[in-house]
Regions:
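Domain-level detector of nuclease and nuclease-like folds
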Residues: 2-176
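Mature, structured domains enriched in cysteine- and short glycine motifs
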Residues: 171-206
Length: 206
């Protein structure tokens, strides 16, 4: 592993789908300004669908493989997939926040890779595979290897096209997903009030 920062985004495949985003994230890659517009990017399977039972109404987000807070990528089509609100906020964001907090607190680097998983020729990913390891301390601070489902409670999704409809029988099964708290429980504890991860020795974790 190296302590030199870098970022790399795989070429889109023959169907225009994202492949893999890979980076060694340090403070120097993290953005100093607010995120710009990404609305011009239409990832594969993109649909504008609104439901009253979805937080924020919109089913789909333009979901960064590597979050903006980590590498400052805006409208990079190689880094944006069609992801549900649930994937973006409840699935990926806690892990992204964990990494961002660690880098800001330590100044260390985190080797980070996110790969969308598509079934066959589907245009919408079934989920994303997230991997991370802190470099300078050989994974003592950050170490996870998780899969986050691209699903939405109460909504049925046709992953081949991105079409969707309301189906209240669909419930997210947390037992099938690895949570951020589970991924590094020996090093970080989730403060349920602030939604932030803290080291076990930190007063904020108690």
């Amino acid at each position: 592993m190296t302590t030199a920062s870098f970022e790399s985004y795989g070429e889109l495949d023959g169907l225009g789908r994202c492949t893999t985003a890979f980076a060694n994230i340090g403070k120097d890659l993290m953005p100093a300004e607010k995120r710009g517009s990404i609305g011009e990017v239409k990832p594969t399977g993109w649909q504008t669908a609104k439901y009253d039972n979805v937080d924020g109404k919109y089913l789909y987000n333009r979901c960064h493989l590597i979050g903006y807070q980590l590498t400052g990528e805006n409208a990079n089509a190689k880094n944006l997939i069609t992801g549900t609100r649930y994937l973006n906020v409840d699935g990926m964001l806690p892990f992204e926040n964990m990494v961002a907090d660690y880098i800001k607190e330590t100044g260390n680097h985190v080797l980070y890779r996110v790969t969308p998983v598509f079934s066959g020729d589907n245009l919408v990913a079934s989920g994303v595979h997230m991997e991370a390891e802190s470099v300078e301390d050989n994974g003592d601070g950050i170490l996870f290897n998780v899969y986050c489902f691209n699903a939405q409670p109460g909504i049925a999704i046709d992953y081949a096209t991105g079409d969707s409809h309301q189906d209240d029988s669909i419930v997210a099964d947390a037992s099938k997903s690895t949570t951020a708290a589970d991924a590094n429980v020996q090093t970080y504890i989730l403060n349920t009030n602030t939604k932030k991860f803290h080291k076990e020795s930190c007063n904020s974790a108690k």
